[in-house]
């Protein structure tokens, strides 16, 4: 049986030296996203896509805005979802994503992001696609991400 899920996340950006993380990779020294955790909108969208495909709720249920998750690295969220939701139950066939951001040029970071996500999820980077878009100035000081995943239930 095949399952498909879609995820979305968006965060405002602010100019500072904390750095912006997308897909677990620092993509900017000049900006950071405003969020409860580290604000990694790409990982948040992927987590929601996986949770949607498995009918397992959403990122807010699994990782609520509480003290335990304040400033937490989103890579940890993805690792937990891999272990608790995917392991032995589902195989990731494909993840496709679109990052819409005007302030940061993403093309130089795409391969590192694909490698990082592949390593966390235990899959080939060939199963992960990341498409950056500028948004043609419509999105200003923000980052928005859409992600879709296709899973195959193990043993079917």
UniProtKB/Swiss-Prot annotation:
Q: Which InterPro entries match?
A: MECDP_synthase (IPR003526), MECDP_synthase_CS (IPR020555), MECDP_synthase_sf (IPR036571)
The molecule here is called: 2-C-methyl-D-erythritol 2,4-cyclodiphosphate synthase
Q: In which pathway does it act?
A: Isoprenoid biosynthesis; isopentenyl diphosphate biosynthesis via DXP pathway; isopentenyl diphosphate from 1-deoxy-D-xylulose 5-phosphate: step 4/6
Residues the record lists as binding 4-CDP-2-C-methyl-D-erythritol 2-phosphate: 9-11, 36-37, 58-60
* Annotated Gene3D superfamilies: 2-C-methyl-D-erythritol 2,4-cyclodiphosphate synthase (3.30.1330.50)
Write down the EC number: 4.6.1.12
What detail does the entry give on cofactor binding? Answer: Binds 1 divalent metal cation per subunit.
Keyword Translocase among UniProt keywords: no
Q: Where is this site: Transition state stabilizer?
A: 36, 134
- Underlying gene: ispF
């Amino acid at each position: 049986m095949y399952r498909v899920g879609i995820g979305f996340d968006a965060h405002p950006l602010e100019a500072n030296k904390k750095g912006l993380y997308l897909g677990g990779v620092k993509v900017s020294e000049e900006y950071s996203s405003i969020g409860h955790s580290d604000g990694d909108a790409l990982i948040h969208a992927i987590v929601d896509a996986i949770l949607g495909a498995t009918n397992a709720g959403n990122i807010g249920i699994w990782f609520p805005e509480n003290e335990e998750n304040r400033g937490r690295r989103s890579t940890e969220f993805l690792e937990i979802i891999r272990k608790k939701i995917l392991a032995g139950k589902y195989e990731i066939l494909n993840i496709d994503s679109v990052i819409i951001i005007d302030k940061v040029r993403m093309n130089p970071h795409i391969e590192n992001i694909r490698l990082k996500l592949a390593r966390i999820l235990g899959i080939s980077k060939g199963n992960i696609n990341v498409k950056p878009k500028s948004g043609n100035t419509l999105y200003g000081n923000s980052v928005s991400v859409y992600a879709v995943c296709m899973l195959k239930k193990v043993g079917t």
